[in-house]
Amino acid sequence: MASRSAGTLLTEFNAAYVPPGLMPGYQGHVPTVAFSFGAPYGTTTLKYFQDHRNRAMEKSHTPFSQGGHFPTIFSTNPNLLLMERASTRDRWLHKPSYTRFNLDSHRSTELTNFYQMVQQHRKYYQDKTGTVPRVPYFAMPVREPERYPLPTVLPPLCPKKKWHLLRLAPENLKTYQTFPSGKRVSPQERKKRDCYFEFRA
């Protein structure tokens, strides 16, 4: 049987004959899209999707539309930011209840924790009373000797403490013994006497 796709169809009209190498294959069918000979199925459906998406995005920018006003944390519109909303119990009404499942859970947890720390830090530097604690994640680093001081490096002493230390120093202690007669005996002489009189019966 003669077939056009196999190239065995014989016709006497040259305009009706299409070579098999130039004959397009199955291009699919989109009911709502007008079919054009030069556009394949993938290009036609992609253009249909992009047109539909662009129309929806343009409509969502108007304040009278039903969609497009979803609360978010990153937006060029300050009215959509979660931080700009009222800090009352109504903020839980605007909290997004949807999640995306195509994300890395570990990275999403890190970003969520970082965002919470950012909000706490923002409350800290906006606080005028000094009652909000500082977030240690955003503390500026200090030099190592200041953060880990050596135990031998002591702060400067006040004159009162210095006087007490000098008074209790070994070289300032009384190391001699005073007898009732007024004679003073050095510890070396006492040691010799103890060695001698230790064995005395």
Swiss-Prot record:
Record bears the keyword Cytoplasm: yes
Cellular localisation: Cytoplasm, Cytoskeleton, Cilium axoneme; Cytoplasm, Cytoskeleton, Flagellum axoneme
Keyword vocabulary terms for this entry: Cell projection, Cilium, Cytoplasm, Cytoskeleton, Flagellum
Cellular component, GO annotation: axonemal A tubule inner sheath; axonemal microtubule; nucleus; sperm flagellum
Tissues where this protein is expressed: Expressed in airway epithelial cells.
Biological process, per Gene Ontology: flagellated sperm motility
Keyword Cell division: no
InterPro entries per the UniProt record, alphabetical: CIMIP2C, CMI2A-C-like_dom
Pfam families, per database record: CMI2B-like
Assembly and oligomerization: Microtubule inner protein component of sperm flagellar doublet microtubules.
Similarity annotation: Belongs to the CIMIP2 family.
Function: Microtubule inner protein (MIP) part of the dynein-decorated doublet microtubules (DMTs) in cilia axoneme, which is required for motile cilia beating. Binds to the intra-tubulin interfaces.
Name this protein carries in UniProt: Ciliary microtubule inner protein 2C
Organism: Homo sapiens (Human)
